[in-house]
């Protein structure tokens, strides 16, 4: 059978259907069970729906003020959770007055017991008004329901409409309390639909060209967006709107004027791309810029769509001249090294082929926190026989994967990093990079360089482990 029960899950046999080992000849539909509530007893690594909305989708918007309607814990959780830097430049050429506003500030209602008993809507209104007085530079306000306010039934939509009329600015209510879905993926969906229904089509861009695109699902993690925008600028393509890396609130309003939507993260933002096509006729193309071949193929596809393939070829040729020799050096150093990829969703099927085909590494394990069935089908097609694919792994499973599959390096998030280090395995953050960008040609070189530096760091030779007395 292709499904396996880890030893640490002996008391939770239902975990078996979430752990799949690829074997030749397996039925096409054999994939891990996914997008379901975490099994009680598992120490999950997942985030909540609120994290998916604020931490992924809206938190990257450079000129919006965020008001979390919650006890203080959710507000703290919503702060500084991603490395998505922003520039101060606005689409009309003006400059937003506060540098990295989205990373520096967050506000919350700090609900108390009495607010839970008697309702917190008045407090929410006061908090929004106070925040706007404190930060008049903000061009919009985003308010968020959380588990507590969702359970007591506070109507954040009504308060948002009321305050919007009072202050003359958009106040967008995001109803994605933590319990809204089994993973943060539900928060992505709620935020996509909310921003589309409330904002898209309500304003016009300062200018348009015949090569306007929306870059959707690109959150500018440690500068990824700026790498891609440079490619497009050299091709003569204008990024009209991004969703939502380094974007301003108004950019979302004129997404309907693009000639094409490019969907980068196909788990968190495919919803708005489909809505734009259905209502406004904006076609979309799913793209992948991780690794050399995927980047080359997708730049060519975009160039061919607009009838300018020669421009894409020039960009590709220029970058390959710059990175070719160094990539070969790191391939020689990384060949045969075993890697475990553990990300939220799509990077698990973006990365295996480039790591194996272009760096000579062996992907021994892939695991995700919130991938859906279509994503697991892609993962299954892109990994080799014997690779273990795990949905929603718990903390004890992480240890067993390390002990059983012996990865030389793990590409994961901050929650897994220090556990890996304690077990003597180097780890690179692949969600919110510590040393990116990792996208595009030069980004893939950065990733190769960082993996080399992590694996060959002499500190791993200095670690001492106690013998297992059992």
Curated annotation (Swiss-Prot):
Keywords: ATP-binding, Iron, Iron-sulfur, Metal-binding, Molybdenum, Nitrogen fixation, Nucleotide-binding, Oxidoreductase. Disulfide bonds: none annotated. Its cofactor is [8Fe-7S] cluster; [7Fe-Mo-9S-C-homocitryl] cluster. It catalyses: N2 + 8 reduced [2Fe-2S]-[ferredoxin] + 16 ATP + 16 H2O = H2 + 8 oxidized [2Fe-2S]-[ferredoxin] + 2 NH4(+) + 16 ADP + 16 phosphate + 6 H(+). Binds 1 [8Fe-7S] cluster per heterodimer. Binds 1 [7Fe-Mo-9S-C-homocitryl] cluster per subunit. InterPro entries: Nase/OxRdtase_comp1 (IPR000510), Nase_asu (IPR005974), Nase_comp1_asu (IPR010143), Nase_comp1_CS (IPR000318). One of its GO terms (molecular function) is nitrogenase activity. GO terms for biological process: nitrogen fixation. This is Nitrogenase molybdenum-iron protein alpha chain. It comes from Methanothermobacter marburgensis (strain ATCC BAA-927 / DSM 2133 / JCM 14651 / NBRC 100331 / OCM 82 / Marburg).
């Amino acid at each position: 059978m292709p499904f396996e029960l880890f030893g640490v899950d002996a008391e939770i046999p239902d975990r078996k259907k979430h752990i799949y080992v690829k074997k030749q000849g397996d039925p096409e539909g054999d994939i891990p069970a996914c997008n379901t509530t975490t099994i009680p007893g598992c120490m999950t690594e997942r985030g909540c729906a609120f994290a998916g909305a604020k931490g992924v989708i809206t938190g990257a918007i450079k000129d919006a003020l965020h008001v979390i309607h919650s006890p203080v814990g959710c507000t703290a959780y919503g702060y500084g959770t991603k490395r998505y830097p922003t520039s101060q430049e606005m689409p009309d050429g003006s400059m937003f007055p506060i540098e990295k506003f989205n990373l520096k500030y967050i506000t919350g209602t700090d609900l108390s017991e009495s607010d839970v008993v008697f309702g917190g809507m008045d407090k929410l209104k006061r908090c929004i008004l106070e925040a706007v007085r404190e930060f008049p530079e903000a061009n919009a306000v985003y308010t968020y329901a959380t588990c507590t306010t969702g359970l007591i039934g506070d109507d954040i939509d009504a308060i948002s409409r009321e305050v919007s009329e009072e202050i003359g600015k958009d106040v967008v209510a995001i109803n994605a309390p933590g319990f809204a879905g089994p993973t943060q993926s539900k928060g992505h969906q709620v935020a996509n639909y909310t921003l589309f229904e409330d904002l898209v089509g309500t304003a016009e861009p300062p200018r348009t060209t015949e090569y306007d695109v929306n870059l959707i699902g690109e959150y500018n993690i440690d500068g990824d967006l700026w790498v891609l925008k440079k490619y497009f600028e050299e091709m003569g393509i204008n990024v009209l709107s991004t969703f939502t890396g380094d974007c301003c609130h108004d950019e979302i309003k004129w997404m309907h004027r693009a000639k094409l939507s490019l969907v980068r993260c196909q788990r968190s933002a495919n919803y708005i791309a489909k809505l734009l096509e259905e209502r406004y006729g904006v076609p979309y193309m799913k793209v992948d810029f991780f690794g050399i071949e995927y980047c080359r193929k997708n730049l060519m596809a975009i160039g061919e769509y607009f009838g300018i393939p020669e421009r894409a070829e020039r960009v590709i040729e220029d970058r390959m001249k710059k990175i070719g020799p160094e990539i070969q050096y790191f391939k020689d150093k990384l060949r045969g090294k075993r890697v475990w990829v553990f990300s939220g969703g799509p990077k698990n099927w973006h990365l295996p082929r480039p790591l194996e085909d272009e760096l000579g590494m062996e992907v021994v394990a892939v695991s995700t926190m919130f991938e859906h069935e279509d994503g697991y089908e892609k993962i299954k097609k892109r990994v080799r026989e014997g690779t273990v694919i795990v949905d929603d792994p718990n903390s004890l499973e992480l240890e067993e994967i390390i002990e059983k599959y012996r990865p030389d390096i793990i590409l994961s998030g901050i929650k897994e990093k220090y556990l890996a280090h304690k077990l003597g395995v180097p780890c690179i953050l692949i969600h919110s990079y510590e040393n990116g960008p990792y996208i595009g040609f030069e980004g893939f070189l950065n990733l190769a360089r960082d993996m080399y530096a992590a694996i060959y760091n002499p500190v791993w030779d200095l670690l001492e482990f106690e013998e297992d007395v059992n």
